Amino acid sequence: MGDEKVMDYKIDQIGIVVKDLDKTAAFLEKLGVGPFPTIETEVPGGKVKIGIFQQGDLQIELIQPLEGDTIHSRWLKEKGEGIHHVSYHCKDIEKELQKLEKLGVKILDRGEIFGVKWAYLDTEPHCGFILELGQWPEG
């Protein structure tokens, strides 16, 4: 690969798994972090409630598992509340995933929500959290 960097993009999101999104958001909003508009959405294996606060180029995403056996519900059960993922924005997720696959990095989960393609990478054993790649729709 030479000098070409893997994931040569900026961090655009920190994802935090929580038991009670409304309670967590209310506390953070008292500290000046927020507001967290919320939605409920399907993810592979179930359903979650998501609240996102945008500050400049960075999003803070609160994720509350609601139904099913999802990567988020398993994380909450096994590790408790806390940082789940750090997301890098990329322009071509398929190209980046191919680079990472050549390095032996496995994909834990992937999908598309509201036009955003995303993939969780199996990095938790190495750094304590999951790295995510996200490709936003153009425009």
List each language-model region with its residue ranges.
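Vicinal oxygen chelate
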Residues: 2-5, 18-25, 30-32, 51-54, 60-61, 67, 78-139, ...
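Short loop/beta submotifs within extracellular cysteine-rich repeat domains
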Residues: 24, 35-36, 70-71, 128-129
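Short, structured motif recognition centered on aromatic/hydrophobic residues
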Residues: 11-18, 28, 53, 60-63, ...
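Long, hydrophobic N-terminal alpha-helical segment
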Residues: 2-46, 55
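Short amphipathic beta-strand starts and helix->beta connectors
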Residues: 2, 67-72
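Regulatory and interaction patches adjacent to catalytic/ligand-binding sites
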Residues: 75
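Short, charged/polar surface micro-motifs in flexible loops or helix N-caps
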Residues: 56-60, 67-69, 93
